[in-house]
């Protein structure tokens, strides 16, 4: 006798309906065909033990079972239940007339109970597309599958309940009903962390707001204890809420990976994934013997946070380059190829040097220039080119923490972000696959973020002086477009520039002779200058762009070749009055001579004379005599 039952196989996000065919003839054997993996081949032993322990008998016959289509690879233990039901129906123990109306999936324990399986949500979507009357799943999976409307989902605890249901005794069974919209919307804004708890750090909040509004990638650089991780963990609270379609797509990925807890329905908040820096390439991007989604796919429509970025394996970081650009990941094997979506915001944090205190005014950095350079070289230029915004973060002094008022709540920031995203949704409504500024193509950048002549002039100067790549040029315009959307402007109009990052200024400082930079670094001397800057929206974007030079290649041979002219003629800086500058520098020299070797003061004075010669100070400025400061 030949009997057919129905189940489904999940490969990536694609689900294929599987016809389970069982034929019984005289004999004593069991054959399973259809390209199943080891778990599928072991199903015969689980089924036999489960039937025996529930008072049923495994048929003594020549059993041939086939999983069609036979050319498609089947993975997992979810075929236990449809195989067991088909075998019983072929033996005449249960009627087969209802098998064509229901799709079955579930793993059998040896005592006959049903265990949860992965990928039930996409299977439920497939069952509805196939116009099945219902879906029978393990009890632990019923809430997950019931979010699919117009499909009766029955959660069963054991195979005996399934047999009773298929025999027509369904008075004791009712489909699971979930109010999808109510459950989804009532949990959207239930956040445990809020930006109102953060005192100070307004510039970092601004950078996170711009990143959230445009979907831009971001990196935060600062010493230990400055609040990098704390700020990153609060980022989901200002992101725009998930739409139902985004939530369904995100929940499917987590269902396939087996990350949904029992009784969990739709994911209502954007995912926030924070893998440890020891993570492997396969765990990050996905794959394995039975390819599963990695962290980048689990962060789809959400945030992937890489804490202590340089501590990650360099080769592991390099595999992020293609997903960051294409927003999907393709896992290729000899016999099949699987594609998972990977549209996420990449947020990273890092220390500026191995000890963590380079540039910190309250601590002394003990790292040599070579150590700092090697530390920064762990992050490649192509990866940095894919990070739109960088932000320096410094610890908030205790007096500021104690006096500062509570910060702006996440709800207020989120409102501005939502308004900016709404403008972008309206702008790109006719363009499939593009929802925010970070997803713009090069053609769209020229259409929606083209600067005027003054803006082009500013960009040209930035490209030449900061040595930006073509990809960085496009990302400047994307960030500029986002800032304009936050301000409610359709055009990139003049605006007061935001405070440039100290490390952006270090790019200009890098143009000085190499030996001067090294001497300044050794004696701990800092230039004293006031930044006066006005520009366009894209001026703020230039300040935010991430490039190789941003991470301080101030000790490279390029700096020595460039000479001091580029730094001298910088359009971004102007020094304060000579009198104030000399007073501040003299104080630094005095302080330096007290904490370093005696020659430090002479080195600092030599630097002052060099700067006066380069016309950065008026010739009339008097320099202190080295002997007057002690030896």
What residues fall within each predicted segment?
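Walker A/P-loop
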Residues: 220-259
């Amino acid at each position: 006798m030949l009997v057919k039952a129905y189940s489904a196989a999940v490969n990536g996000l694609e689900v294929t309906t599987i016809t389970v065919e069982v034929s019984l003839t005289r004999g004593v054997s069991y054959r399973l065909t259809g390209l199943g993996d080891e778990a599928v081949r072991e199903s015969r032993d689980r089924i036999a033990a489960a039937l025996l322990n529930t008072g049923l008998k495994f048929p003594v016959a020549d059993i041939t079972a086939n999983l069609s289509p036979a050319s498609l690879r089947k993975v997992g233990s979810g075929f236990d239940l449809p195989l067991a039901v088909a075998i019983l129906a072929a033996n005449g123990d249960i009627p087969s007339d209802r098998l064509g109306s229901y799709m079955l999936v579930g793993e059998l324990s040896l005592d006959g109970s049903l265990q949860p399986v992965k990928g039930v949500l996409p299977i439920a979507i497939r069952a509805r597309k196939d116009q099945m009357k219902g879906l029978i799943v393990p009890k632990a999976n019923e809430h997950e599958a019931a979010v699919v409307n117009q499909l009766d989902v029955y959660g069963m605890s054991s195979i005996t309940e399934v047999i009773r249901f298929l025999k027509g005794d369904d008075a004791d069974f009712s489909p699971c009903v979930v109010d999808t919209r109510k459950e989804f919307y009532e949990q959207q804004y239930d956040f445990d962390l809020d930006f109102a708890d953060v005192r100070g750090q307004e510039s970092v909040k601004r950078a996170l707001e711009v990143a959230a509004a445009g979907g831009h990638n971001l990196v935060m650089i600062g010493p230990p204890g400055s609040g990098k991780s704390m700020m990153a963990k609060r980022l989901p609270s200002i992101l725009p809420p998930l739409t139902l379609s985004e939530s369904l797509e995100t929940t499917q990925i987590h269902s396939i990976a087996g990350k949904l807890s029992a009784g969990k329905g739709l994911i209502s908040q954007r995912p926030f994934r924070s893998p440890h820096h020891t993570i492997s390439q396969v765990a990050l991007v996905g794959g394995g013997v039975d390819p599963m989604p990695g962290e980048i796919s689990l962060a789809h429509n959400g945030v992937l946070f890489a804490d202590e970025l340089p501590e990650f394996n360099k080769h592991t970081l390099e595999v992020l380059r293609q997903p960051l650009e294409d927003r999907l990941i393709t896992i290729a094997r000899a016999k099949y190829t699987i594609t998972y979506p990977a549209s996420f915001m990449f947020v990273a944090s890092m220390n500026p040097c191995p000890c963590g205190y380079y540039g910190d005014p309250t601590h002394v950095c003990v790292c040599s220039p070579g150590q700092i350079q090697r530390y920064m070289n762990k992050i490649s230029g192509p990866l940095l080119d894919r990070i739109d915004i960088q932000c320096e973060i410094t610890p908030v002094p205790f007096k500021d923490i104690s006096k500062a008022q509570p910060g702006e709540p996440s709800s207020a920031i989120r409102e501005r972000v939502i308004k900016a995203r709404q403008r972008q949704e309206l702008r790109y409504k006719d363009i499939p696959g593009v929802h925010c500024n970070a997803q713009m193509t090069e053609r769209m950048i020229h259409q929606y973020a083209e600067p005027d002549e003054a803006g082009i002039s500013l960009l040209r100067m930035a490209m030449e002086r900061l040595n930006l790549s073509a990809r960085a040029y496009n990302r400047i315009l994307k960030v500029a477009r986002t800032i304009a959307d936050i301000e409610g402007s359709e055009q990139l109009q003049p605006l007061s520039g935001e405070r440039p990052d100290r490390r952006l200024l270090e790019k200009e400082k890098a143009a000085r002779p190499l030996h001067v930079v090294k001497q300044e670094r050794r004696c701990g001397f800092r230039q004293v200058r006031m930044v006066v800057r006005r520009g366009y929206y894209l001026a703020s974007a230039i300040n935010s762009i991430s490039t190789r030079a941003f991470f301080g290649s101030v000790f490279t041979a390029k700096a020595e070749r460039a000479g001091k002219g580029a730094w001298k003629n910088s359009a971004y800086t102007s020094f304060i009055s000579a009198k104030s500058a000399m007073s501040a520098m003299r104080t630094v020299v005095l302080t330096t001579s007290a904490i370093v070797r005696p020659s430090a003061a002479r080195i600092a004075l030599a630097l002052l004379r060099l700067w006066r010669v380069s016309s950065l100070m008026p010739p009339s400025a008097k320099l202190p005599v080295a002997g007057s400061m002690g030896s």
